[in-house]
């Protein structure tokens, strides 16, 4: 079953072609795919049953991302590029090998056309990469027939077979003029860059002629050849035909937010994409220019040979600061890429707004469910409390606040309990009375708003202790419920009412999910605070009995090392740097070697 986060993102997928990237819980890309329709393809992973490797992959997906393209063919080539870049685990298993073909015109006196899997700086012309080896080969064979160069091994004193077939210019028996090669190479370059109109028209005429003459096999061959050419040669916006390293920036702004896309073009391919979203303080132009400059001020950031930006920016100023050319594409492939980045920026920001709206509906709905389960009117603010101590030592309490189902972390509070003075730190009822008294006495004194619901981690002891203070000491009427856990220490139900009624929520409901979040969050907050306090107090108490370590020295040690283990592991020289003599430093390390067995934390 997909998580709520993934369900929300699935509902926002566009009906457009593109590449999608599946990520695990650590944000690592584990699978890259392509789709003619992103919505249908990505949803199919989570809405259908699978087995084998697909099921294994889906079980690890914690998030996904996508890049919209103009055509499904661009999605195919982008998928190739991303697989080569990230080497995702499941792609490597499902698609062995990462070599994809290029069509190459060699740099020789008598050049030839060939298929290669490697780009070298040898002066040759490279076109690709292409997704289909067979299609690339068929296109190359077509070029050899229509735009022949050299197909033989060179001069041999007599015409080769390919010359007689019209597929070689004759380097096998004569000196071919360089201009003849140059003109032919220009025709091939135009063809491979997408200018295939004349060639396709010629093939179509041949196919129709063959069909008219009942040469159906020949007509079918030509039809397949046309298909291969369309599949392989059609110009791609994602792929650039030169090797200049470029970074392309574009943005979209709406409702006080700016969405920025950065396309990294390396080795003639889109190698990486970064997305950024943040609220706008200045104008979009100022924010965007500031982002670009900060982008290259990051540590270890390597600048490209060229930066591409949309119109209306101060290109000269940016170029002067970055010390590299900053240009705005006016036509062709680069302008199309710029438009694609703008489109992805808009989709990213619109997705954020929709997710915010969905999250808002979900969390408000969850709070409404929680209040309804307790037969209470709709409320907005819930405060939850939990205690932590080790067999009564270093007792603390923590309070977290949720507003409309969302954590309000600025309103979280931590309390060191006065257990040594007033009660046993292991007394859960006394701990509850103290923290409830302190929290709501303070709110009354400050005339601050009171919560609509108080949740106590635990059971009837904590719940009734809280109610006792609120009703009998502070004269407050705030509903209090206990968050009950099962024997696996997981959220199970609520305890509420004068009769300590057990109220079960639907485990699949948003209300139950919110209750789990609140209980986990307050427990985490309390435990973290207790660990910090206990470590500090344990270190201080261990240091008190060591001869030569007075209050000032203890303070220095606490500030520098913070834990006993760090002092034990520290070289004597580090301890002596605090102004401690070698003799005292040695006594200190010796005294700390015997650690007491830690007691259970609750």
UniProtKB/Swiss-Prot annotation:
Subcellular location: Cytoplasm
Keyword DNA repair appears in the UniProt entry: yes
Keyword Cytoplasm in annotation: yes
Any single GO BP term: nucleotide-excision repair
MF terms (GO), sorted A to Z: DNA binding; excinuclease ABC activity
One cellular component (GO) term of this entry: excinuclease repair complex
UVR domain residues: 197-232
Function: The UvrABC repair system catalyzes the recognition and processing of DNA lesions. UvrC both incises the 5' and 3' sides of the lesion. The N-terminal half is responsible for the 3' incision and the C-terminal half is responsible for the 5' incision.
Protein name: UvrABC system protein C
This protein's encoding gene: uvrC
């Amino acid at each position: 079953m997909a998580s709520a986060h993934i369900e929300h993102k699935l509902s926002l997928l566009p009906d457009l072609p593109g590449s999608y990237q599946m990520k695990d819980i650590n944000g690592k890309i584990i699978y890259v795919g392509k789709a003619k329709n992103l919505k249908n393809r990505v949803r199919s992973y989570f809405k259908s049953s699978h087995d084998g490797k697909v099921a294994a992959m889906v079980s690890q997906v914690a998030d996904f991302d996508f890049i919209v393209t103009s055509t499904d063919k661009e999605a195919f080539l982008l998928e190739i590029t991303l697989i080569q870049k990230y080497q995702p685990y499941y792609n490597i298993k499902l698609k062995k090998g990462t070599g994809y073909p290029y069509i190459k015109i060699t740099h020789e006196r008598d050049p030839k056309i060939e298929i290669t899997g490697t780009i070298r700086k040898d002066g040759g012309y490279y076109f690709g990469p292409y997704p289909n080896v067979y299609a690339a080969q068929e296109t190359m064979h077509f070029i050899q027939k229509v735009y022949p160069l050299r197909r033989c091994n060179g001069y041999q004193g007599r015409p080769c077979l390919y010359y007689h077939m019209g597929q070689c210019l004759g380097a096998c028996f004569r000196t071919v003029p360089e201009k003849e090669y140059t003109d032919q190479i220009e025709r091939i370059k135009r063809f491979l860059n997408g200018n295939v109109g004349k060639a396709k028209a010629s093939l179509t005429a041949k196919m129709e002629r063959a069909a008219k003459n009942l040469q159906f096999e020949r007509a079918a061959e030509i039809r397949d050849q046309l298909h291969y050419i369309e599949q392989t040669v059609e110009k791609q916006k994602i792929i650039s035909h030169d090797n200049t390293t470029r970074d392309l920036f574009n943005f979209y702004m709406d409702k006080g937010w700016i969405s920025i896309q950065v396309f990294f073009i390396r080795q003639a391919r889109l190698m990486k994409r970064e997305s950024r979203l943040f609220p706008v303080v200045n104008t979009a132009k100022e924010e965007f220019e500031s982002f670009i400059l900060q982008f290259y001020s990051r540590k270890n950031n390597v600048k490209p040979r060229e930066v591409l930006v949309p119109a209306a920016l101060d290109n000269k100023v940016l170029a002067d600061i970055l010390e590299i050319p900053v240009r705005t594409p006016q036509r062709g492939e680069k302008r199309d890429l710029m438009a694609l980045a703008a489109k992805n920026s808009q989709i990213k920001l619109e997705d954020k707004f929709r997710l915010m709206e969905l999250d808002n509906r979900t969390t408000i709905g969850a709070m409404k469910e929680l209040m309804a389960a307790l037969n209470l009117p709709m409320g907005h603010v819930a405060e939850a409390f939990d205690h932590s101590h080790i067999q009564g030592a270093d007792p603390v309490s923590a309070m977290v606040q949720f507003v409309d189902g969302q954590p309000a972390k600025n309103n979280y509070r931590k309390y060191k309990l006065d257990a040594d003075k007033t009660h046993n730190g292991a007394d859960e009822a006394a701990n509850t009375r103290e923290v409830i008294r302190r929290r709501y006495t303070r709110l009354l004194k400050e005339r601050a708003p009171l919560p609509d619901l108080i949740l106590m981690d635990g059971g009837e002891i904590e719940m009734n202790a809280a109610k006792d203070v609120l009703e009998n000491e502070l004269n407050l009427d705030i509903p209090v419920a206990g968050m009950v856990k099962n024997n696996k220490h997981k959220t199970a139900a609520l305890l509420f009412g004068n009769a300590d009624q057990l109220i079960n929520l639907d485990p699949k409901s948003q209300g139950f999910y919110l209750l789990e979040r609140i209980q986990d969050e307050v427990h985490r907050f309390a435990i973290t605070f207790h660990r910090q306090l206990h470590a500090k107090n344990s270190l201080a108490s261990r240091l008190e009995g060591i001869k030569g370590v007075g209050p000032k020295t203890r303070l220095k040690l606490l500030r520098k090392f913070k834990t006993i283990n760090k002092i034990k592991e520290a070289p004597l020289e580090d301890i002596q740097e605090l102004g401690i003599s070698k003799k005292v430093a040695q006594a200190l390390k010796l005294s700390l070697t015997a650690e007491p067995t830690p007691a259970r934390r609750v």
